């Protein structure tokens, strides 16, 4: 009996122990992260079943009970919703399409089985034809969806905030206009006409726009996966004709090949850059044919950059070389991929001609006039490179540089855009002279947000277009700030005077013989060369933008057009914005208020030369040479004087008078009066004669006594 009781107690103890262990195991599994996720998935699956099944279904109770029992709940009183009739069970194809496309856009939720197109790659290794949709019957002229005119004063109104429709800034600008009347000369308002069309892009991600050089063709690129290249043609009555829609990988850069280039003989060729490290040369068929587009050449950047050096596979910037680049083949393609600069030859294989790593490079620009010269925006500075040299660069120090562009009509002007996303620093544009890198020529301020695009005008060398995230498109006029100057040029130079002297002697070759010799001898004595202004010169006034277009959305890309709309005498600017709209803007080029307009008039060319005493001057200059100045060509320099007295250091000075020169046959535009000829007293130079020189250098005391030649005037030729 005792043995039976002991066995029963042992059994009860083991049962209690097993129950205690089961509770501990249940507590551990219930509080673990994996169990919580499983419970959540069971609850979610339970709700899905209870929603999609009808309560009248006899198998409803069983299915619901199974789901709720797995969750540990009762089945009584469970409320269910009727199953929708249009419900479709999710298939494997839909799941792939959902994860392969962008889920934010409703058009991407459709599967390939519903649209009738299976998942396939647009490009294959042995398939060099892109898919284009061209239906001659569906080609029709598109009318603009909006047409408005923007009237702005100079300086322009402050940029508004577009968080909510608030136009109080217009009233404030009108109140400020009265204060500006005393400072700036008022001019009539400038009207900017804008037309816009909605591009049928499903992704709503327009990235680039390009305008043909000789024909009214516009190419618009999108970052979508299909149907992302649109080709349009502008008509005379401000209409737009849609010709083709082509499927390429996500496009981030477009450039039309110039008709003057060798490859362009095949037809309309478009250079494209994509987000997968590829660049193409695409041959577009005739606009009124149904032939597909053809890829002439493909450039793969991934094969030439190691994986560890690859920061981004997106190619945003590409450019084509000009005929001035004699070191490369005509129509060579330059691209920027993951801080590496590539130069491709379309006639060669898949190997680039040149590869150069540029640290922190975000954008670049090729010089259209100088062979091998490249400017790269590298964040904290702008780097000037010569691709013909193995290494070496010149840096222009200016922070937050994200864009740069060489002027297509001036070989020395370079524009850089500086933007700060954090808003701690200003957003501005700086104009540089590539020959003088000490500091910028001008600083253009006015944008309140990041600058997205930078484009020089194709008609005026002094006009610059910029667009920003603040919703403004601005036209800057720096004509009075960077005008044509008299030769020798009037620049502030702080470098080596000896090198500057050699440069002046070379620039003096265009003068007549006697005047050229006078200038070269004057340079030997003058402490400040002739083309250096006095330090106490007047401070340059800031350049103002002449017109602007205020939009509700930021412009993603800007391109200067080579055509003018009907009824407008101003060039056009083509833009694409973030909402999928294409805009054509006619922006007038007004004269800034802070300068006086130039009045062309015919002037008499006179000579004004500063003379210096020299022992060898009597032997070099004769009366015949001096009188020859009166018989020179009409291109006598207006900066030279009509009469000068040359005095030697001998007791019997030789005097000669040059008669007045003939009137010039060309017209000049002068904004300030000429200074009269300088009357310089007799000076005797002292000191040792330098080797290799035919004149004596004056002493330091006499050198300081020499006055500086003040040539502070504006001179330019007009047609």
UniProtKB/Swiss-Prot annotation:
**Which parts of this chain are annotated as the region Disordered?**
1-144, 677-707
Question: From which residue to which does the signal peptide run?
Answer: none
Domain of life, per UniProt, equals Eukaryota
A GO cellular component term found in this entry reads: Rpd3L-Expanded complex
Q: Compositionally biased, Basic residues: which spans?
A: 18-29, 122-136
Work out whether the entry's keyword set contains Cell membrane. no
- Polar residues compositional bias, start-end: 30-39, 48-68
The WD repeat units are at 201-242, 246-294, 310-354, 396-442, 446-486
Instruction: Could you list this entry's UniProt keywords, alphabetically sorted.
Output: Cell cycle, Cell division, Cell wall biogenesis/degradation, Repeat, WD repeat
As one GO molecular function, the record gives: histone binding
> Which BP terms does GO give this entry?
cell division; cell wall organization; chromatin remodeling; regulation of DNA-templated transcription
The record's annotation in InterPro entries points to: WD40/YVTN_repeat-like_dom_sf (IPR015943), WD40_repeat_dom_sf (IPR036322), WD40_rpt (IPR001680), WD_repeat_RBAP46/RBAP48/MSI1 (IPR050459)
- Compositionally biased residues, Basic and acidic residues: 691-703
Summary of the function given for this chain in its UniProt record: Involved in cell wall metabolism and required for the separation of the mother and daughter cells.
Q: State the family named in the UniProt similarity comment for this chain.
A: Belongs to the WD repeat DSE1 family.
Name of the protein this chain belongs to: Protein DSE1
Please report the organism this UniProt entry assigns to the protein.
Answer: Yarrowia lipolytica (strain CLIB 122 / E 150)
């Amino acid at each position: 009996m005792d043995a039976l009781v002991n066995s029963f107690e042992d059994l009860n103890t083991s049962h209690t122990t097993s129950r205690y262990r089961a509770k501990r195991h249940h507590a551990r599994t219930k509080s673990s992260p994996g169990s919580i996720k499983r419970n959540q998935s069971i609850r979610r699956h339970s709700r899905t079943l209870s929603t999609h099944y009808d309560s009248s279904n006899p198998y409803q109770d069983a299915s619901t009970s199974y789901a709720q029992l797995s969750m540990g709940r009762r089945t009584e009183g469970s409320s269910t919703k009727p199953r929708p009739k249009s419900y479709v069970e999710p298939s494997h194809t839909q799941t792939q399409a959902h994860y392969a496309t962008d889920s934010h856009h409703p058009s991407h939720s459709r599967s390939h089985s519903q649209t009738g197109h299976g998942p396939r790659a647009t490009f294959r290794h042995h398939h060099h034809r892109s898919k284009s949709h061209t239906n001659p019957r569906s080609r029709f002229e598109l009318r603009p969806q909006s047409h408005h005119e923007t009237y702005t004063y100079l300086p322009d109104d402050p940029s508004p905030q577009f968080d909510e429709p608030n136009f109080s800034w217009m009233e404030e600008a009108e109140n400020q206009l009265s204060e500006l009347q005393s400072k700036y000369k008022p001019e009539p308002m400038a009207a900017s006409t804008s037309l816009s069309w909605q591009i049928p892009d499903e992704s709503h991600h327009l990235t680039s726009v390009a305008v043909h050089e000789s024909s009214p063709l516009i190419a618009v690129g999108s970052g979508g996966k299909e149907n992302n290249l649109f080709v349009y043609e502008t008509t005379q009555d401000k209409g737009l004709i849609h010709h083709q829609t082509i499927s390429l990988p996500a496009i981030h850069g477009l450039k039309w090949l110039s008709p003057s280039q060798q490859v362009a003989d095949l037809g309309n060729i478009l250079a494209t850059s994509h987000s997968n490290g590829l660049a193409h040369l695409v041959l577009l068929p005739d606009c009124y044919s149904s032939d597909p587009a053809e890829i002439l050449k493909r450039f793969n950047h991934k094969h030439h950059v190691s994986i560890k050096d690859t920061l981004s596979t997106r190619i945003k910037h590409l450019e084509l070389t000009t005929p001035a680049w004699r070191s490369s083949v005509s129509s060579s393609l330059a691209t920027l991929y993951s801080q590496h600069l590539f130069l491709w030859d379309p006639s060669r294989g898949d190997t680039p001609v040149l590869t150069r790593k540029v640290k922190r490079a975000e954008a670049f620009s090729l010089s259209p006039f100088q062979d091998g010269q490249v400017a790269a925006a590298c964040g904290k500075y702008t780097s000037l490179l010569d691709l013909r040299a193995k290494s070496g660069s010149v840096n222009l120090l200016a922070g937050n540089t994200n864009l740069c562009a060489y002027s297509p009509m001036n070989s020395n002007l370079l524009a850089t855009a500086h933007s700060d996303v954090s808003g701690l620093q200003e957003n501005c544009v700086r104009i540089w002279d590539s020959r003088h890198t000490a500091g910028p020529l001008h600083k253009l301020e006015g944008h309140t947000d990041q600058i997205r695009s930078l484009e020089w005008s194709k008609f005026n060398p002094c006009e610059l277009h910029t667009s920003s995230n603040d919703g403004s498109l601005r036209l800057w006029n720096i004509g009075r700030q960077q005008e044509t100057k008299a030769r020798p040029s009037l620049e502030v130079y702080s470098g080596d005077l000896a090198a500057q002297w050699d440069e002046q002697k070379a620039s003096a070759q265009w003068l007549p013989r006697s005047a050229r010799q006078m200038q070269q001898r004057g340079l030997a004595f003058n402490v400040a060369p002739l083309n250096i202004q006095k330090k106490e010169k007047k401070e340059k006034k800031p350049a103002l933008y002449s017109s602007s277009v205020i939009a509700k959305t930021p412009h993603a890309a800007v391109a200067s057009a080579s055509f003018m709309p009907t009824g407008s005498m101003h060039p056009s600017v083509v833009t694409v914005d973030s909402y999928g709209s294409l805009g054509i803007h006619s922006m007038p080029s007004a004269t800034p208020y802070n300068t006086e307009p130039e009045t062309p008039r015919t002037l008499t060319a006179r000579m004004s030369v500063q003379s210096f005493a020299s022992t060898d001057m009597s032997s070099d200059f004769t009366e015949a040479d001096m009188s020859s100045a009166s018989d020179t060509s009409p291109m006598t320099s207006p900066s030279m004087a009509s009469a000068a007295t040359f005095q030697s250091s001998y007791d019997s000075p030789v005097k000669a008078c040059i008669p007045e020169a003939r009137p010039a046959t060309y017209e000049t535009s002068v904004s300030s009066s000429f200074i009269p000829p300088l009357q310089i007293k007799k000076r005797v130079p002292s000191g040792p004669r330098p080797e290799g020189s035919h004149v004596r250098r004056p002493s330091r005391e006499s050198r300081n006594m020499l006055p500086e030649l003040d040539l502070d005037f504006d001179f330019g030729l007009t047609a």
